[in-house]
Amino acid sequence: PIPSRGLGDVYKRQILLTIGFGLLAYSLSTFADERKDRSLIFWRSLPVSDLTTVLSKVLLVVLVVPLMVIPHIILLQLVAMISASIFFTTNDIVSFGWLWGSYILTDWFRIVFSLWAQALWSLPLFVWLMLAGTYATRPIAGAIIPPVVLIVLERIIFKTNTVLEFIENRVGFWSRADSFPKEYNEIRVVDISDIFLLFSSQAFWIGIFASMVIIAGIVYVLSL
């Protein structure tokens, strides 16, 4: 299983970064673009609640997009495995059967689980960007200025960096290190068992609660 796991881990950061930037851009622009082209008025004329509209966009970010990358994952890993097979076979480094005896299919799903875990971990950022797109004339400024003000005020008044640390943690990759920094300090593709670890993390549920509050704010702004 070593070759396949190694290839999967190599893909992890590239895939997470690519999808992550795409989701951040989508989250920031989705409601902002609808306000600009007036399509928001059309959607509000449909018999669909604002909450349903917001949740559909959140589910797209968290669940649907990770599934859309499966074909790309399969293609990339097959190309890498074929290339490695040719190289190893011609150089008598490792047997062809041992290389393809790795858990390729398992790795594909592990990467998808990694994307799901990361999307849930970074959900507060996604919904915050959506909120900025609903009320701010300049969404980028609306997304950046309020957190900066909170960070500065917290530092001046309380001499702490809770807000800054929260944002830094959500921007970074989630790993076992976020729950057990001493015992598990590696960054790797998430195993299915890590999902249960994520769900048992207090920091995860704090993020989910913050996301729910922000989603409520989005629904309120849309209803105005």
Model-derived segments and their meaning:
Residues 30, 115-122, 207-211:
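Residue-level hotspots within the lipid-embedded alpha helices of multi-pass solute transporters
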Residues 24-27, 39, 128, 218-221:
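Hydrophobic/aromatic residues in alpha-helical transmembrane segments
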Residues 82-93, 160-185:
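Juxtamembrane non-transmembrane "cap" segments at the membrane-aqueous interface
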Residues 5, 9-23, 56-130, 134:
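Secretory targeting signals
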Residues 4-36, 185-209:
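Membrane-embedded or membrane-proximal helical elements that form or frame transporter/channel pores
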Residues 30-60:
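Helix-loop-helix units of permease transmembrane domains in multi-pass membrane transporters
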Residues 126, 140-153:
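Central hydrophobic cores of alpha-helical transmembrane segments
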Residues 129-141, 193-224:
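Junction motif at the cytosolic side of a transmembrane helix
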